[in-house]
Swiss-Prot record, chain A:
Component of the mitochondrial ribosome (mitoribosome), a dedicated translation machinery responsible for the synthesis of mitochondrial genome-encoded proteins, including at least some of the essential transmembrane subunits of the mitochondrial respiratory chain. The mitoribosomes are attached to the mitochondrial inner membrane and translation products are cotranslationally integrated into the membrane. Keywords: Mitochondrion, Ribonucleoprotein, Ribosomal protein. Coiled coil: none annotated. This is Small ribosomal subunit protein mS33. Component of the mitochondrial small ribosomal subunit (mt-SSU). Mature yeast 74S mitochondrial ribosomes consist of a small (37S) and a large (54S) subunit. The 37S small subunit contains a 15S ribosomal RNA (15S mt-rRNA) and at least 32 different proteins. The 54S large subunit contains a 21S rRNA (21S mt-rRNA) and at least 45 different proteins. Transmembrane segments: none annotated. It is found in: Mitochondrion.
UniProtKB/Swiss-Prot annotation, chain B:
It holds the Pfam family Ribosomal_S14. This is Small ribosomal subunit protein uS14m. It comes from Schizosaccharomyces pombe (strain 972 / ATCC 24843) (Fission yeast). Component of the mitochondrial small ribosomal subunit (mt-SSU). Mature yeast 74S mitochondrial ribosomes consist of a small (37S) and a large (54S) subunit. The 37S small subunit contains a 15S ribosomal RNA (15S mt-rRNA) and at least 32 different proteins. The 54S large subunit contains a 21S rRNA (21S mt-rRNA) and at least 45 different proteins. Belongs to the universal ribosomal protein uS14 family. It is found in: Mitochondrion.
Length: 93, 105
C-alpha cells in the first residue's frame, strides 16, 4: 500500500510529464472555460452565404443578368395597368 | 440562385443569435472562468456573473438551434446535411447529396 505522500509525489510528477495542470484534493477551477476551443466562427458559418441578382448587378455594375422575378413582377404590373387596376398615382404637393 | 429571403423568420433570429454569440464569445468565456473559479474572492466572482448576465439575450449559446439551411424549418433537420426531411428527400432523389441513394432491395 503506497502512502499518501508517495501518491501525491506521483501526481505531481505525472502532471509534469504529461503537461497537465496539477490539481490537489480534486478541487475544481474554471480552467475548462479558458482551455475550451472557441466555436463562434464555426457556428456563424452554418447558413451558406447567398447573393441575389440585385446585389450581383450592384457589385458588377452590370445590367446583363436577367432577373426573372423582377420581369414577372413588371409583366403583372403592366397587365394591371392595362385593366385600369394599377397602383394609384401619388399625390402632388 | 436564391437569396436568404426564402428562410423562415425564425431562421433569421437564429442567424442573429449566431452572429452575436461569435461577437461576444471571448468576453463570455473569460467571465465564466472568473465566475466558476472558487479560489477567487466572492465579490470578484459575482461581478463576473453580472457581466455575463449583462450580455445581450441573443448572445447566449442556448439560443442557437440548427435549422434547415434551405427552408428554415426547426424540426426534423438532419445534422449531417443541415436539411429538413422534405428538402433532404428532394435533393436525394435528384442525386445531389453525395453518398445518399434510394433504398432498393
Amino acid at each position: 500500500m503506497a502512502s499518501k505522500a508517495i501518491l501525491e509525489e506521483l501526481n505531481i510528477l505525472s502532471s509534469k510529464i504529461f503537461g497537465t495542470q496539477y490539481k490537489s484534493n480534486n478541487s475544481r477551477t474554471g480552467r475548462k472555460f479558458v482551455v475550451q476551443e472557441l466555436k463562434g466562427a464555426k457556428l456563424k458559418s452554418y447558413y451558406p452565404a447567398t447573393i441575389n441578382y440585385r446585389q450581383l448587378r450592384t457589385l458588377l455594375n452590370d445590367k446583363t443578368f436577367p432577373d426573372s422575378d423582377e420581369e414577372l413582377r413588371m409583366e403583372i404590373r403592366k397587365g394591371r395597368i392595362r385593366q385600369g387596376k394599377g397602383a394609384s398615382k401619388s399625390k402632388k404637393k | 440562385m436564391r437569396a436568404l429571403g426564402h428562410l423562415k423568420h425564425k431562421a433569421f433570429r437564429d442567424l442573429l443569435c449566431r452572429r452575436l454569440f461569435a461577437e461576444h464569445e471571448v468576453e463570455r468565456q473569460s467571465n465564466l472562468y472568473i465566475y466558476r473559479n472558487p479560489e477567487l474572492p466572492l465579490r470578484v466572482r459575482l461581478e463576473a456573473k453580472k457581466r455575463i448576465e449583462a450580455l445581450p439575450t441573443n448572445a447566449h449559446p442556448t439560443k442557437i438551434k440548427n435549422r434547415c439551411i434551405e427552408t428554415g424549418r426547426g424540426r426534423g433537420v438532419f445534422r449531417a446535411f443541415g436539411l429538413a426531411r422534405f428538402p433532404f428527400r428532394l435533393k436525394a432523389l435528384a442525386n445531389k447529396l453525395p453518398g445518399v441513394r434510394k433504398a432498393s432491395w
